Amino acid sequence: MIKVEEALTIIEANSAKMPAQQIAVSKALGYVLAEKVISPIHMPPFRQSAMDGYAFIHSIKHQYDIVSTSQAGDHSNLKLNANEAVRIFTGAFVPDDADTVVMQEHVIANKNSILIAAMPAKSANIRPKGEQIA
């Protein structure tokens, strides 16, 4: 039995390089790209919430004051403190300071604060900038 690296070397040495062709996308089934396709834009163009819930700075605390709301289409320069959270909706901008979004189903909420009943892992439920197209 040979190692994977050795097998790949043998395959590359015995494979013919095909010349690049320009063809219509509708006729491209079965072809491979000759070069990487890189988008000139990032989608989403910001860190985005993957859930309805609350964005906050992850810590061992479980209680946070609700200081703002972020809905899809909003973009804020809000600065969060360690004991603060933002009510956030799916697809909304995640404030720069926030590093985690907890699902609304995992909190006990009242008008001004939340108590996190099931603490998510740090970075949970945040889509990075450019996750869909980069």
Which functions belong to the PLM regions below?
Residues A55-A134:
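Short, glycine/charged-enriched hinge/interface segments at domain edges or termini
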Residues M1-D65, N112, I126-E131:
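Short, low-complexity N-terminal leaders and the immediately following helix N-cap/first helix
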